[in-house]
Amino acid sequence: RRVLFRSQAVINEAHSRGLVVPDRVRGKEGETQAAGAYVAYPKKGLHEWIGSMDLNSLYPSVIRALNMSPETIVGQIRQDRTKDMIRNGMASGMSFAECWEGKFACLEYDIVMNQDIGEDIIIDWENGKSQQVSGKEAYDIIFLNGQSLMLSANGTIFTYETKGVIPGLLERWYAERKDLQKKAKTAGDSKEFEFWDKRQLVKKINLNSAYGALLNAGSRSEEHTSELQSRGLISYAV
């Protein structure tokens, strides 16, 4: 039921914008498994000045920050180097997760963010065109040409000219939760506090479970969001 609720919420959000939601195309089981999140390995030993932080609604915040939604994808950097790295690692006996040890993003993302002039990458645009450029040129195209583009750690390029359906839905839920939290704080008695507190908790669960629900095989959006997840920052978190 939770999966159906979140899937229907996305559909309703799209319809409210006058958008048509594609029919679901059923694939074979196991074709679209989601990768696990990025986990940094601890550095053993005694350390000074240790700190920690807890990002507010991490996955929803990442989706909103990069405007991640299937309809906002405008390009994808080919992951040739990254695929070779994984293929070679697994051939040597490493697991898929072990191939990613110590890495936050795909190798091509690092080339772009380091503005490497000696390494070329290929960008496949949604309009069917492909473009071979250096890391520096790709950085300029994405961040410096005023094209309202964002780049995820897996090399997916999103536009933020218009707000995506999924980020827009999460933004509304987030605002609604904040409003419910305010009502809980100003409640006149414990019964009223409990009423509003439970409602804000429901919103919190909706926000934090949306990522997994949209990737669930029972979700109508699964075949679209699994592609998004496999290419997006939320695979490895921030």
Where are the model-predicted features located?
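Conserved acidic
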Residues: R1-S226
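Short "domain-exit" segments at the C-terminal end of structured domains
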Residues: E227-V238
